[in-house]
Regions:
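Membrane-interface alpha helices of multi-pass inner-membrane proteins
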Residues: 40-45, 245-261, 265-272, 343
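Hydrophobic alpha-helical membrane-interfacial segments at the cytosolic entry of transmembrane helices
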Residues: 87-101, 251-253, 284-309, 383-389
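Membrane-lumen/periplasm interface segments of specific transmembrane helices
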Residues: 108-111, 153, 276-280, 286-366, ...
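Extracytoplasmic catalytic/substrate-binding loops of multi-pass membrane glycan-assembly enzymes
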Residues: 109-123, 129-153, 163
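Hydrophobic/aromatic-rich transmembrane helices and adjacent perimembrane loops
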Residues: 125, 220-228, 265, 407-437
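Signature aromatic-anchored transmembrane alpha helix within multi-pass, membrane-resident enzymes
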Residues: 244-253, 267, 271, 291-301, ...
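Membrane-embedded, lumen/periplasm-facing catalytic core of multi-pass transferases
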Residues: 466-520
Length: 585
């Protein structure tokens, strides 16, 4: 916990610098700092200076904090405690409480979701141990062309908190929470508290609708939406401030392009909003100068650098998720399209509920602005653009199923809600923030005339927020309990297996239970040459060792079949225990 406190202090050094030097909103500063640190670490990692970059960033944060406190003490008569109270809003208190609750519950949380083993968790472990980006020689990471920004930041966190799966989850949560905190940027929550509570309610809706990704793992699908909305909020608030809006688009759009492959879609949305405000509010004599639109080029630089690195360092033709289109499977492609359309219209999916809420909010907005035709026209234009973007996102998701996903996964529309909900969250968040901003401009919070009623509303909205957070935490506790009692991956942890020395040992794993993924072996044994035994004795000759993970009946049946004896959980050399006939076969 003390290491976490120090880490937060180091981060706050940068936050205080942004607030003091550039007058950036305290709500927006945290995600700008985290994203900026990730991009800086990425740039150094390209130069093979990953570890020096992390130490430089970490200790520089303390120097900046010391300078800030020194300057503050000279320019203000306030004590540090008074300054803290003045800058620490009730929203900050709620988010601090959220973070502390999450840390308490997540510090012992294991990685659960499949993708944590196949790439996200494995990539963080690789960065932690090897302190460099992967190359084509590092076969242990199959998905090594995945953008690394969030993994690099999580690695930065675990380098100073200590390596554990719980610390990985806490690091990922820090990025998500910082992005959600930025939603409050355009609102004056001190003057009009109700708007702050409505934004909290929006976040609660996100918690409740998220039925697949959750924040107790390392998946980044929801983070894409939160970062995009954070960017929208910041760009709107600083639409007339070219310096800060340029900083926002360079950092957040650049970061989005390195969060996930589909992040470039949302980066382009941020760039489009930035260009719109630039064209509207910048009165420069030369409308299309290179200097004016230089931030756009800088925004695309991290993505271009990563693509160049992938092109130079990897043979991507071997990846199952590389872009392709097999014309011989047109009948299957047609089935995928039909199934995608039906699934998109299914009223029982969270993404459809989100679309329904968007339509409801648009209709309500049109109704309440009926007397203001000019404003109503703006809302209609905004809504039209919003639905066009959502349609484009759905079409791009369908194209991913058709061209960039293995057929066995595509035909089942694997992770449909997880992918579509990202776009829906962006749409729902955008229209909700617009509606709350309209509400803020029409409602004053100064009068005591309905103070009793307001307290009830505020209490109710805070209650809903913490109930939604509790829903996520209870879900995490249930998942953890099931995972511990039924999963194959957790057997590695029970046996204390967590190798940190990269190796090429060929290990055949004998185990039975749920979450039967080979990738858990890659993570814990730290070798690319490990697989679960599927019942075919002919494969045993290809391995150096067998690992018996448990004493379950199905596992021991396989052990008896291969060795002719019962073996306790542990490692065994194939030549010592396996029937010679199987080795020579």
């Amino acid at each position: 916990m003390f290491n976490l406190f120090l880490f937060i202090l180091s981060t706050y050094g940068y936050v205080s610098c942004l607030e003091k030097r550039l007058a950036v909103s305290p709500y927006l500063s945290w995600i700008l700092v985290i994203a900026g640190q990730s991009l800086t670490i990425f740039a150094f990692a390209l130069l093979n200076l990953l570890q020096p970059a992390m130490y430089l960033i970490y200790y520089l944060g303390f120097i900046l904090l010391a300078v800030y406190l020194f300057l503050q003490s000279r320019s203000s008569q306030e004590s540090f405690l008074d300054l803290f109270k003045r800058k620490f809003s009730w929203i900050s208190l709620i988010f601090l409480l959220t973070f502390l609750i999450w840390v308490i519950f997540m510090k012992e949380m294991p990685l659960i979701f499949w993708d944590n083993f196949s790439h996200w968790g494995l990539i963080v472990k690789f960065f932690f141990n090897e302190q460099r980006l992967a190359t084509d020689l590092d076969k242990i990471i199959y998905y090594r062309s995945y953008p690394p920004a969030v993994s690099l930041y999580i690695n930065y966190v675990v380098n100073f908190l200590g390596y554990s799966e719980g610390h990985m989850i806490i690091g990922n949560f820090m990025v998500n929470l910082a992005a959600l905190y930025a939603f409050f940027t355009p609102f004056n929550v001190k003057k009009n508290k109700i708007t702050g509570f409505l934004v909290l309610f929006l976040i609660a809706v996100f918690y409740l609708m998220d039925d697949h990704v959750k924040m107790y793992n390392l998946l980044v699908d929801n983070l894409l939406a939160y970062l995009t909305l954070a960017g929208f909020a910041g760009l709107y608030h600083y639409r007339e401030n070219r310096k800060i809006s340029s900083l926002i688009v360079i950092i957040l759009a650049g970061f989005l392009g390195l969060v996930k492959g589909s992040g470039i879609f949302f980066a382009v949305l941020l760039i489009a909003v930035y260009c719109y405000y630039l064209a509207k509010y910048d009165k420069a004599k030369v409308p299309f100068s290179l200097k004016k639109y230089l931030p756009v080029l800088l925004t695309l630089l991290p993505f271009a650098m990563w693509k160049l690195y992938v092109r130079l360092m990897y043979d991507t033709s071997q990846f199952r998720h590389s872009v392709h289109f097999d014309w011989s499977q047109l009948h299957l492609k047609a089935k995928i399209v039909a199934k995608f359309i039906l699934q998109s219209l299914d009223p029982w999916t969270p993404s459809t509920w989100g679309l329904f809420l968007i339509v409801v909010i648009v209709l309500v907005m049109l109704l309440v602005t009926a007397r203001d035709k000019k404003l109503q026209k703006k809302i209609m234009t905004f809504s039209g653009i919003l639905f066009a973007v959502l349609l484009l996102y759905y079409l791009s998701t369908m194209a991913m199923y058709l061209t960039a996903m293995p057929m066995d996964e595509a035909i089942k529309l694997a992770q449909f809600d997880r992918y579509t909900l990202t776009g829906v969250f962006v749409g729902l968040g955008s229209i909700s923030l617009v509606a709350i901003k309209y509400f803020e401009s029409r409602v004053e919070d100064k009068s005591d005339h309905s103070l009793y009623g307001k307290k009830h509303i505020y209490s109710g909205l805070i209650g809903i927020y913490f109930i939604s957070l509790a829903y996520d935490l209870v879900d995490a506790v249930i998942e953890k309990r099931n995972f511990i009692s039924e999963s194959i991956p957790y057997e590695y942890q029970k046996m204390g297996i967590d190798n940190h020395k990269l190796n090429n040992k060929k290990v055949l794993v004998l185990a039975s239970g749920k979450w039967n993924t080979d990738n858990a072996g890659n993570l814990y044994l730290y070798t690319p040459n490990t697989h679960l035994y599927k019942g075919n004795p002919d494969v045993v000759k290809n391995y150096d060792q067998i690992l018996v993970l448990d004493n379950k009946e199905a596992t021991q049946t396989w052990v008896k079949e291969l060795t002719g004896q019962q073996l306790a959980p542990g490692f065994y050399d194939v030549k010592d225990v396996v029937n010679e006939k199987l080795i020579q076969k």
